[in-house]
Amino acid sequence: MSKFYDIDLPFGIKYEGTLSELLTADTNKLIEVKTERDKWKETGNIFVEFVWRGTLSGITTTKADWWATILTLEGEIQGIILLPTNIMKAKVKKLINEGIASYPVKGGDDNASEGALVPIKELMNYEG
């Protein structure tokens, strides 16, 4: 057991409660949920939508407090990327500006969306 158990426990309980509230909808926070099918496993990228059929959409217009991307493989959830929307927006913008994320890219159903291909590894490791 950590010698800082008495300090770590309240800290852990606080954030355990935050996640529990988000997952049980026992909060006034909104979560935007997107799902990536199998292709992410091959490419290592997720698609972040900015425009749909010529109209601003997705991360550009969301009012959600949290942005969730569910990663599925053969119909089974493999993981979930969950970030505060403001942090997701900032990270994606920086990755685009630095040429790490590809933008603009067509995607989504019928390639009706325009957005960014964002490398998952860089998204999760990126500081800034």
Residues covered by each model-derived region:
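Short, surface-exposed beta-edge/turn micro-motifs
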Residues: 28, 56, 63-67, 77-78
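Mg2+/Mn2+-dependent nuclease catalytic core
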Residues: 37-61
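Hydrophobic side chains in beta-strands
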Residues: 33, 69-70
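Non-catalytic C-terminal interaction segments of nucleic acid-processing enzymes
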Residues: 1-7, 25, 54-55, 72-128
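Short, flexible, glycine/charge-rich loop motifs used to bind or transfer phosphoryl groups or to couple energy/partner
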Residues: 19-22, 56-58
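Nuclease catalytic cores
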Residues: 4, 8-20
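Conserved catalytic cores of phosphodiester-cleaving nucleases, focusing on short active-site segments
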Residues: 22-39
